[in-house]
Amino acid sequence: MYKEYSDLKDKRILVVGLGKTGVSLAHFLTKHGAQVTVTDHKSKPELSVQLEQLGELPIKFELGGHSPKTFIAQDLVILSPGVPSNLKIFDYARSQGIKITGEFEFSAGFIKEPIIGLTGTNGKTTVAKITEAILTESGVKTWVGGANEKPLVDYLRLDDKAQVVIAEVSSFMLEHCDTFNPGNIVFTNLAENHLDRYRSMEEYVNAKRRIFKNTNQATTSILNADDNAVVELARDPAVQRGRIFYFSRKPALEPQIMNIGGAVNIGDEIRVRTGPEIESFNIKGMKMRGKHSVENIMAAILASREHGATREAVQKVINTFTGLPHRIEYVRKVGGVMFYNDSKATNVHAVLRALDTFDENVILIAGGKDTNLNYEPLRTSVKRKVKTLILVGEAKERINRDLGDFSETFLIGTFEEAVLIAYQKSRIGDVVLLSPGCSSFDMFDSFEERGDYFKEIVRKFH
């Protein structure tokens, strides 16, 4: 793979997918002398905004479909995120000796600065943002991108580079990773997800496992000791090649973790060891709710300490970081009822974490696009915590089959109606929680749009 910008001169490169990433790639590649072709299954009118962003760049276009002859005339094919990697035309191109890669893998190869690679089913963006906050407070210049809609190629286009790059890495990105080798790997947790894309949980895990493919003695892996699937992954010889720091909320693991290095939560304290000394941080003033938030903070402390984070910066961020929108986000209190927006909860594991946050009676709004997930693991929490279950969207029947017997349940036609009924069913002291356990694409363009609509409805209540 190319490592220097000069390697791109006169190379014939095909960019598949003309979304935000495709546009950025086209700008970067043409600037460095590549002969660029862009292909997309959408038509010219559908891509008018993107085509305008490319202006007069010397690019060839193949729009409205993909032809084999375009693929086999290239030195390299780069797929934008979201383009399925299993299309038959890609198999054909590979059979003709054409190299196919993803934007993330391609862009990462040019980055000379240290990279923190963050993966896991949930928590990636929050850990990235806490890590960024700690390092920024410590005077370390960072750049955050990857799976959070800011492609790595955007970093390559910057003149003013960071000291540390924090990259969120999804399973889709890892499918194409052959050479990606971050100095630090953070693995937050591992649970069933994306089963509309993967044929089995094993296939999903194998995609995630690829982040460890190129580890060496200089790699530090930061792993969740409380997640059995992550601990199982840690037995992989590739992980064992480098140093491992574990983080845990189990005080019983404290002697073991302090011996090898890592972080442990005991009461209102996080104990951390990344060098000879053991440090303690107080979490009494922590603003975020939920036990999982403590896990996220521990992961971020360990990652940032590898890059010069100061003790003072860590404590300040613990005391001031308020969390991110759409992640157990407090909206408002109406008539003694608290409303929380957890629209980012697009899988079962995320809903479990949300329910675990509350001691109050919960009216849970769930449902969305059906991605073949199994909701049975929620039964105990629903039985214990959920007073009323409001189901909406494409997956409502599936969720009802798995959970409907464990709580008063309503299957609702529209999202707005679901929120209204949740409010009607609530009483003083209750929590109304939007934590869908599904992606948003049956009714909305994104989890952000879904969460914003929820907040808009709730703000009209009086």
UniProtKB/Swiss-Prot annotation:
Positions bound to ATP: G120, T121, N122, G123, K124, T125, T126
UniProt entry keywords in alphabetical sequence: ATP-binding, Cell cycle, Cell division, Cell shape, Cell wall biogenesis/degradation, Cytoplasm, Ligase, Nucleotide-binding, Peptidoglycan synthesis
GO molecular function, a single term: UDP-N-acetylmuramoylalanine-D-glutamate ligase activity
Main localization, broad class: cytoplasm
Family: Belongs to the MurCDEF family.
Any one Gene Ontology cellular component term annotated for this protein: cytoplasm
Coiled-coil portions: none
Location in or out of the cell: Cytoplasm
Alphabetical list of NCBIfam families matching this protein: murD (TIGR01087)
Top EC class for this record: ligase
EC number per UniProt: 6.3.2.9
InterPro entries: DHPH_N (IPR039648), Mur-like_cat_sf (IPR036565), Mur_ligase_C (IPR004101), Mur_ligase_C_dom_sf (IPR036615), Mur_ligase_cen (IPR013221), MurD (IPR005762)
Pfam family membership, one: Pyr_redox
Protein name according to UniProt: UDP-N-acetylmuramoylalanine--D-glutamate ligase
Catalysed conversion reaction: UDP-N-acetyl-alpha-D-muramoyl-L-alanine + D-glutamate + ATP = UDP-N-acetyl-alpha-D-muramoyl-L-alanyl-D-glutamate + ADP + phosphate + H(+)
Keyword Metal-binding: no
GN (gene name): murD
Function: Cell wall formation. Catalyzes the addition of glutamate to the nucleotide precursor UDP-N-acetylmuramoyl-L-alanine (UMA).
